[in-house]
From Swiss-Prot:
PANTHER family: IMMUNOGLOBULIN-LIKE DOMAIN-CONTAINING RECEPTOR 1, TRANSMEMBRANE AND IMMUNOGLOBULIN DOMAIN-CONTAINING PROTEIN
Topology of the protein relative to the lipid bilayer: Single-pass type I membrane protein
Sequence ranges on the Extracellular membrane side: 24-167
Protein name (Swiss-Prot/TrEMBL): Immunoglobulin-like domain-containing receptor 1
Biological function: Maintains epithelial barrier function by recruiting MARVELD2/tricellulin to tricellular tight junctions (tTJs). Crucial for normal hearing by maintaining the structural and functional integrity of tTJs, which are critical for the survival of auditory neurosensory HCs. Mediates fatty acids and lipoproteins-stimulated CCK/cholecystokinin secretion in the small intestine. In the inner ear, may regulate alternative pre-mRNA splicing via binding to TRA2A, TRA2B and SRSF1.
Disease listed for this protein: Deafness, autosomal recessive, 42: A prelingual, non-progressive form of non-syndromic sensorineural hearing loss. Sensorineural deafness results from damage to the neural receptors of the inner ear, the nerve pathways to the brain, or the area of the brain that receives sound information.
Domain Ig-like V-type, first and last residues per copy: 24-162
Biased composition (Basic residues): 458-467
One GO CC term on file: plasma membrane
Main location: membrane
Subunit note: Homooligomer. Interacts with MARVELD2 and OCLN; the interaction is required to recruit MARVELD2 to tricellular contacts. Interacts (via C-terminus) with TRA2A, TRA2B and SRSF1. Interacts with PLSCR1.
GO molecular function, one term: identical protein binding
Amino acid sequence: MAWPKLPAPWLLLCTWLPAGCLSLLVTVQHTERYVTLFASIILKCDYTTSAQLQDVVVTWRFKSFCKDPIFDYYSASYQAALSLGQDPSNDCNDNQREVRIVAQRRGQNEPVLGVDYRQRKITIQNRADLVINEVMWWDHGVYYCTIEAPGDTSGDPDKEVKLIVLHWLTVIFIILGALLLLLLIGVCWCQCCPQYCCCYIRCPCCPAHCCCPEEALARHRYMKQAQALGPQMMGKPLYWGADRSSQVSSYPMHPLLQRDLSLPSSLPQMPMTQTTNQPPIANGVLEYLEKELRNLNLAQPLPPDLKGRFGHPCSMLSSLGSEVVERRIIHLPPLIRDLSSSRRTSDSLHQQWLTPIPSRPWDLREGRSHHHYPDFHQELQDRGPKSWALERRELDPSWSGRHRSSRLNGSPIHWSDRDSLSDVPSSSEARWRPSHPPFRSRCQERPRRPSPRESTQRHGRRRRHRSYSPPLPSGLSSWSSEEDKERQPQSWRAHRRGSHSPHWPEEKPPSYRSLDITPGKNSRKKGSVERRSEKDSSHSGRSVVI
């Protein structure tokens, strides 16, 4: 029986079909992959074979690059190989590069890792996919997927996949991260100091001071610039400056500057000095200074503590200290050089006895009034005691009676010619000072307070000389003699005793005694006078003229 002849195409198909079914074919999805350090990656690989799957062996090999595709890409040799159609990263012998077995698996068994990958997280999944967890620095190279199937001798048993690890990029990222960390630390440090704040990033180290207020920073900056430019712009220190509450300001230390702040004319006119070659001032500084000056209220009253401290003007010496010290002003009597020593002694004693206690605080004008009466002193010395006695008898008819009664009631008193100068005529309503013996017995008594009438008349006679003697009631008289006292009738003496001055608490007021005494007694009398002046000054709290 003869077989029919088949056409030629069918004959070729029948002969090629068994050969194609018995061959091995390996395929990969990507021939080149990029990955960073410590990342995970899956290298896809698949195959077709006629052999049994349990007999197929999958092997992944690693070969390093001949030339690095990253660092050597712009080299001349690399570019020349690319121009010739070659692959300079993989076109070299295996003895010129490093070759390692990564993993191997037979059938569906567990993969076996290579010697250099025993501690790595690497596995083979699906048919032939390689999974690498945490890519390392030395994983940068070419990976070959090789399939071994028994009985398949033809075909392409392996495929390559380039794994490019961007380790240089990771290094750059690490460096940048370190710089960012330092910058973050610096930012947090700046945020903790608001006056030097440089950004507005919220930091975990100091969350309470983050997001610096722009107005506070600008105010602080303007104040520092104003303090730096203040001494250059003003010729004199700003005693009445805007910052009254500042401790550096000298405003509270000068009480004269606090006088009449509400009056525009009381403000000191401070000259402005023209400065040359000064750096330009920012507009913000000028605007801030103008705003502060507009808000300045010069008529604002002083705080109560400053009013209490500087309520009255003080002298130059007292203004240097922290407390106002009350001082007594003591004026010595003027010296008369044309008199003899005995006359100067007696006159100074009379001036000490006859100087009244001032009834108001001491004034410089009152102190100057002592020097306006040199003619009055000379007139007293020229006229003598006799002329004063004659005038006293002519003006006062009852003077002779009082003269006699004083001699009857008191012991004999001897007056010198110079001591009788104290008996100048004056009004009978002025106060007078007692002599030493009654004063010693009554030194503890407070002086009586003058009546309003006496104060008014004494104020009217303030410019009169102080060396006058008051009226001597109840028969005490420095002009009396023994004969006048004998001629005085008893009824007159009794009448004078009954009608003594109501200002004296006792019946017999103190009397003047003679000042013609020994030097020892004179010194004791001076001491008593000085003690009396000190005691009166301590009682009154006012100045005393000695």
